[in-house]
A protein has these predicted regions:
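Conserved beta-sheet core of the metallophosphoesterase superfamily
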Residues: 166-229
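Conserved catalytic scaffold of divalent metal-dependent phosphoesterases
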Residues: 67, 88-177, 206
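Active-site glycine-centered loops adjacent to acidic/histidine catalytic or metal-binding residues
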Residues: 6, 50-51, 85-86, 159, ...
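Binuclear metal-dependent phosphoesterase catalytic core
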Residues: 118-123, 203-256
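Core catalytic region of metal-dependent phosphoesterases/phosphodiesterases
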Residues: 7, 13-120, 179, 183
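Short active-site segment of divalent metal-dependent hydrolases/proteases
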Residues: 9, 54, 162, 193
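Extreme N-terminal starter segment of soluble prokaryotic enzymes
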Residues: 1-2
Length: 256
């Protein structure tokens, strides 16, 4: 399973510069990666763990068309699953309208708005079960889903805040989803900085989105369903935010 999350199309008021950067990432780096993974494993699938769009109130037409084009291309080569993230919803729960409806008519693409059990097959053999829990807006509801499916699935895919992990600002998350309620491993979107423990993996955004990403190596996770192991491929393509000391900046010449 190829995992991606928090791609946030429409960032910075639908900036054309950001659209171009994101478009290049998908067409020149990510889609070629997907094709390489498919060459190794024809049964591979793609799961996006939420926040395809940035703005929950209004979506720029050019941004929407770009997103549709990209996912039409992806779905033409690999089965795609997309969970609702909080930025994809009109309300702070999963009861409102979803901007992902724009993608609902794409063949080979499944939108996950309600908790769904996914069963994956490789070589005609059932190798893994995943409980997909989209953003529900209430940690208590998400905890109930983890308890309900605790021993029924190998992994939980989510878009949520998880206790004992970190917000992007470094503060510890408290009073949120309790990953210990689930017997398997929890893999989630929502937090943009990558984090890994034995129990939880925040896969993070695939590219830098703001200065809060300074120092965070972005990339793509791939989940091997046979070994149940995650591997990480760094994104060495996209621009990054960085800090430059004032003295060093002042000494830069025009060619730097």
């Amino acid at each position: 399973i190829i995992l991606i999350s928090d791609i946030h199309f429409g960032r910075y008021n639908s900036s054309e510069e950001w659209q171009e950067s994101m478009s290049k990432y998908f067409y020149e780096w990510f889609i070629p990666l997907v094709k390489r993974e498919l060459a190794k494993n024809p049964d591979a699938v793609l799961c996006c763990l939420g926040d395809v769009y940035q703005d929950r109130n209004a979506i720029n037409i050019d941004v929407n068309n770009l997103v549709i084009d990209i996912f039409e291309e992806l779905a033409s080569i690999i089965p795609c699953y997309i969970l609702n993230g909080n930025h994809d919803l009109s309300k702070s729960s999963n009861k409102g309208n979803s901007s992902l409806r724009s993608l609902s008519n794409i063949n080979n693409l499944t939108l996950i708005r309600d908790t769904t059990m996914l069963q994956f097959v490789e070589g005609r053999k059932n190798v893994a079960k995943v409980i997909a829990v989209p953003y529900l807006g209430e940690c208590a509801l998400e905890n109930k889903k983890l308890v309900e499916f605790s021993t029924k699935a190998d992994f939980a895919f989510m878009h949520t805040e998880i206790s004992k992990m970190k917000f992007d600002n470094g503060m510890t998350i408290v009073g949120a989803v309790d990953a210990e309620k689930f017997a398997g491993r929890v893999i989630s979107g929502h937090i943009h900085r990558r984090q890994e423990t034995d129990k939880v993996v925040y896969i993070g955004s695939p590219y830098h989105l703001d200065r809060g990403d300074i120092g965070d190596v972005k990339g793509i996770y791939t989940l091997d369903l046979t070994t149940k192991e995650l591997s990480f491929t760094p994104n060495d393509f996209s621009p990054i935010f960085t800090r430059v000391p004032v003295k060093e900046f002042m000494e830069m010449d025009d060619a730097t």
